[in-house]
């Protein structure tokens, strides 16, 4: 896209924004830059995505009594967004994250045996890459996790048991959908 000349009107963007380009400096220049950046975002950016939590994805049993509901898979960065829930108290083995994890407590309580805090509804937690801990979830808990990269699970003797990433959680979701005779929602990849 070529920039408008000093006498042209920039194209309408983002709900009808228009501007007259008459000066190469000052407030008009800022507006021109903002409009140019909005145009770049509309042409090059990813679209907004809505996932219906009831019809756009499925809970599946993962480990023990812990269920997973996938909300997003992104193959460029390795990001995946999942919700974990359990009815009885549950634990997930000792594991290490190779990327950052962000968590939001929807309901119940949860934490890691290695830490003193307990997540409760509304709490937000950030975990740094390389941390090793053992997840516990209280009865009736539900937590949304934004995970980047892989998770390595360890045996009791600290040997590596398995490595999971976005492709692993997608595979488990697809297998669950196939067992139920439903089509996996490919729009979860964005």
Give the location of each predicted region.
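A short, N-terminal "cap"/entry segment at the start of jelly-roll beta-barrel domains
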Residues: 2-78, 163-164, 170-172, 176-190
């Amino acid at each position: 896209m070529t920039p408008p000349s000093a006498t042209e009107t920039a194209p309408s963007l983002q709900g009808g924004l228009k501007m007259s380009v008459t000066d190469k400096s000052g407030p008009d220049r800022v507006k021109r830059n903002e409009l140019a950046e909005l145009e770049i975002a509309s042409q090059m950016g990813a679209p907004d995505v809505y996932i219906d939590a009831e019809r756009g994805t499925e809970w599946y049993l993962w480990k023990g009594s812990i269920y997973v509901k996938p909300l997003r898979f992104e193959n460029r960065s390795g990001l995946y967004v999942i919700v974990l829930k359990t009815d009885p108290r549950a634990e997930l083995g000792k594991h290490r994250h190779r990327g950052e994890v962000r968590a939001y407590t929807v309901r119940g309580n949860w934490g890691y045996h290695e830490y003193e805090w307990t997540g409760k509804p509304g709490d937000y937690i950030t975990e740094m890459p390389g941390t090793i801990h053992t997840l516990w979830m209280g009865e009736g808990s539900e937590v949304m996790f934004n995970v980047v990269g892989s998770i390595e699970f360890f045996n009791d003797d600290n040997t590596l048991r398995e490595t999971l990433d976005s492709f692993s959680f997608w595979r488990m979701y697809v297998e669950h959908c196939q067992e139920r005779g439903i089509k996996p929602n490919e729009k979860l990849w964005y």
